[in-house]
């Protein structure tokens, strides 16, 4: 479900949109630098923009609106992660700023709630509210990047917050185009990653229409495992999903494919599972992220032990698979993978 909104949003304007409305390439460049440049967020449409004539800017004011979003709550983790509860029309979402030594990552949401029912994800317990608009997605980045440490600017965006991006693909594709356009925000295509639980038609369209990176939440070495954890994935078998990545690898060799594998104790964490994953990924050259399960109140699932995760990692690396073990970030404020559900931490 997508709201019918008129006029469309200011922070969903591509360079093509700006040139069309402002009737000038140079004015469009100036406006883009200002709209997407580093400044405090405001939901009020500016009356003027430096370097753009009032008459030209009035055409933008007459045809666009500013996303009505505001930060309702901020929570800070001991590891530097910051979670934002962002209020908007029809509900609220969560956005996370994750700092590292050299750059920060902004984790954005694509829906209020989620259309999927993954057993290990807190967002699934919220049900589905609505799809976000492209300007609301981009606004999350513009707001959260201002919280990044000066020595670690926000250079990465991951669509791994609330929602299934492939179920809101029209708006996600616009947001990815805006985030990667020059002169601003000017993120690299490899630095924008869209995650999916495995919606094959959406994946196919995303790979055809975007240069962004794709992350597939695999989370099982067999279809039976995967369906038990993610019931709505039964429509598209693992083999079909990975065949698509294999085909895309042959036509777009520079694109990065990520395989996300959340590890659960006694469910998907054996050496046999690891060997099956190696076989499944043959010919894809994907980067595998092993993710310890972050606990949520509504699920009895437990994370695999550190030793089991290490053993799984060794099997994959020994077979030549590029693989990393991801450390939980923001777990103490319910900001880690699978924990986003408006949980108050204070």
Task: Briefly describe each language-model feature range.
Residues 1-90, 149, 246-256, 261-346:
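Auxiliary Fe-S-binding modules of radical SAM enzymes
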């Amino acid at each position: 479900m997508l709201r019918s909104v008129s006029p469309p949003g200011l922070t969903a304007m591509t360079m093509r949109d700006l040139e069309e409305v402002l009737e000038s390439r140079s004015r469009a460049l100036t406006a883009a630098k200002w709209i997407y440049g580093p400044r405090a967020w405001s939901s009020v449409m500016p009356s003027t923009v430096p370097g753009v004539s009032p008459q030209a800017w009035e055409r933008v004011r007459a045809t666009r609106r500013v996303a009505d979003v505001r930060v309702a709550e901020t929570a800070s983790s001991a590891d530097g992660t910051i979670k934002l509860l962002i209020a908007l029309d029809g509900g609220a979402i969560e956005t996370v700023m994750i700092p590292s030594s050299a750059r920060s990552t902004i984790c954005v949401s694509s829906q209020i709630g989620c259309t999927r029912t993954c057993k290990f994800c807190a967002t699934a317990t919220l049900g589905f509210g609505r799809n976000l608009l492209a300007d609301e997605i981009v606004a999350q980045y513009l707001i959260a990047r201002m919280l990044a440490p000066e020595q670690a600017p926000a250079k990465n965006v991951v669509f791994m917050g609330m929602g299934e991006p492939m179920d809101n693909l029209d708006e996600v594709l616009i947001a990815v185009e805006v985030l990667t356009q020059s002169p601003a925000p000017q993120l690299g295509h490899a630095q924008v990653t869209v995650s999916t639980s495995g919606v094959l038609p959406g994946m196919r369209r995303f790979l055809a229409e975007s240069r962004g990176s794709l992350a597939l939440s695999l989370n099982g070495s067999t279809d039976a495992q995967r369906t038990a954890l993610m019931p709505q994935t039964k429509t598209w078998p693992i083999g079909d999903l990975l065949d698509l990545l294999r085909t895309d690898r042959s036509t777009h060799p520079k694109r990065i494919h990520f395989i996300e594998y959340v590890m659960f104790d006694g469910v998907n964490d054996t050496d046999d599972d690891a060997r099956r994953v190696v076989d499944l990924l043959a010919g894809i050259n994907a980067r595998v992220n092993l993710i310890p399960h972050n606990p949520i109140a509504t699920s009895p699932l437990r994370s695999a032990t550190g030793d089991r995760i290490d053993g799984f990692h060794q099997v994959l690396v020994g077979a030549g698979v590029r693989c990393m073990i991801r450390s939980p970030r923001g777990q103490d404020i319910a900001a880690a993978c699978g924990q986003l559900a408006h949980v108050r931490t204070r």
